[in-house]
Amino acid sequence: MSAMKRLFQLMADKKASDIFLSVGAPINIKINGVAMPINQQMMDGNTVRGLLYEVIDQKQRKEYEDTLELNTAFTLQGVGSFRISAFRQKGSPAVVVRYIPNIIPPLDSLGLPPVLKDIILEKRGLILMVGATGSGKSTTLAAMLDYRNEQRTGHIFTLEEPVEFIFQNKKSIVNQREVGTDTLDMRVGLKNALRQAPDCILIGEIRDKENMTSAIQYAQSGHLCLATLHANNSYHAMNRIISFYPLESRTALLQDLSATLKCVISQRLVKNVRGLRSAAVEVMLNSRYIAELIEKGEIGEMKEAMEKALTPGSQTFEQSLFKMIRDGIITQDEGLANADSANNLLWLINNTAAGADFAAGKERNPQAKPAAGVGSSAPFSEFKLDSSETERA
């Protein structure tokens, strides 16, 4: 097995999220949000380039050499898929690889709000999944889609760049198109998506006005449309969407969003008491009041509306983190460090019955001890690069 494939296997064995290949540094691997070197071998440009070239073809090599950028994916049979981003830095090659496991986790196994099951079974509307890079957006969306796949007949259609999780046909037929492999570009794929009779559409990441407009149009035409967006929370997501459009188009945009948006799900991963990571989730359901705020452009009022919402399933990050603290999943310090408003979280801890019990040291569940051999401190068997392997690539 080549050196790069052995690295991929190591990522799977250690449940790592990323590896980093950079000149002048050893290979670094990230586990549970903590990056560490796997050995003390400093890499040079030939080594980094050789590792990359082991897993890309001649066409991809030419693209990288011509454009100095490459985004692609590699599947290792029985192990999983790996999202590869190659670039140049300080005149030298560099690579970041994200691990996408073979198995889509069951929705119930992720500790997510139960309302997500109801949301993914909706007939129409726009669902936005937002969060920072590495926050688990893709995993949560894949688990939600696979739950629909198990529960509903129909056609699930994805347009991704690249395809990440691989779905099996269950009750639904699932067709997955990859930009660059199955369609020439995102624009062409988006234009033709409605002609392929989908019931549920995943269009990957929204990066610009064109993608956003397509997502809204799909929802308006009676489809359930899912997409991801880089934003910290619902408020930032709405502001980012608005920023895609010129001032003269925003009134129409806000009217369309207020009518089509089903919910915004925001996620961030926080360190739990076992040394692993758990998802804190904000859910903004588009209630009648939220829809009115969106239509009026009063985005700054949404946070308070969510805090006071009587809509079952809606919750802010502070409410999600409070539940995790109360249930002994995370420490109070970890919760405060990840809250949008530490003051609001402290208020919940000190001014609710469950919070008062926690503050008095009466946690519902005692903190679990870290699992032995699990997490970022798990030992590595020594990984050495044979220079002859990379030189042959």
Regions found by a protein language model. Give the residues of each.
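Short, flexible helix-loop junctions that flank or precede catalytic/ligand sites
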Residues: 1-393
